[in-house]
A protein has these predicted regions:
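Active-site neighborhood of HAD-like aspartate-dependent phosphohydrolases
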Residues: 1-68
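Metal-dependent phosphoesterase signature
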Residues: 24-51, 76-85, 99-102, 114-120
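A short alpha-helix capping/helix-coil boundary motif
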Residues: 34-37, 72-73, 164-167
Length: 227
């Protein structure tokens, strides 16, 4: 499988409570929005939203951010389950978020299905998913020819794997772009893309970081990708 598994919510289905200020909140999934397990989240029945996740997503939206979930999901390429199961899992997470707060809409969910050995440009810490999310949300150019009702595979530019980890952190497409995750690969992808970097406690998730994230003057944590 080449490319990212995408779920894109049509703009018409998302209520515009506030104006989009241009920033995107990139969120890891497991350990940020729902409980993560060492054996993966393998079915909708295993989706357990972390308390306050729905309210936190709604806060971000009401403050002007759009939401893009970016998650590594190698079980697809490992043959544990398929693309349809992934969509079912994500649909259940969306449902739980909205049950907690009706404003907790997610604009885009992107999942890398690859293993480390597949050497793709989308598996975090490589920044392919973040740049793709930016293109989708900001109306840039991307190949949507394989999408049906906003779902399907989108190819990633393999050159996005060429990251100078010994260089300096790049500038993001927008100064308010941020990334929240619970693992080193999440910090790395934020650095490679240029986003403000926030780290979640996987037992608490996004609710433990939301006040810092919405502070536009907070640059987040410092991260050295080769340290």
């Amino acid at each position: 499988m080449r490319g990212v598994i995408a779920q894109i919510t049509p703009n018409s289905s998302i209520p515009k409570e506030v104006d989009f200020h241009g920033g995107i909140a990139f969120l890891d999934r497991d350990g940020v929005l729902n409980v993560g397990y060492s054996t993966y989240v393998n079915s909708p029945q295993e989706v357990n939203m972390l308390p306050g996740a729905g309210k936190s997503v709604a806060i971000l939206r009401r403050k002007g951010w759009k939401i893009c979930i970016v998650t590594n999901q190698s079980p697809v390429m490992r043959g544990l389950w398929d693309e349809n199961t992934l969509h079912d899992i994500n649909d259940e997470l969306r449902r739980q978020l909205l049950d907690e707060d009706e404003g907790a809409h997610v604009d885009v969910i992107l999942a890398c299905p690859h293993r480390s050995r597949d050497r793709c440009a989308c598996r975090k810490p490589y920044p392919g998913m973040l740049f793709l999310g930016s293109e989708i949300i900001r109306g840039g150019n991307y190949d949507n020819s394989n999408l049906i009702d906003g779902r399907g595979i989108i190819a990633i530019n393999p050159m996005l794997r060429n990251v100078d980890w010994w260089g300096t952190k790049t500038e993001p497409p927008h100064r308010l772009d941020l990334m929240l995750g619970d693992r080193k690969c999440d910090l790395g992808v934020a650095w490679a893309y240029g986003a403000r970097i926030f780290r979640a406690n996987p037992d608490i998730g996004i609710a433990g970081q939301i006040n810092e994230m919405i502070d536009e003057g907070n640059e987040g944590v410092t991260f050295n990708p080769v340290g």
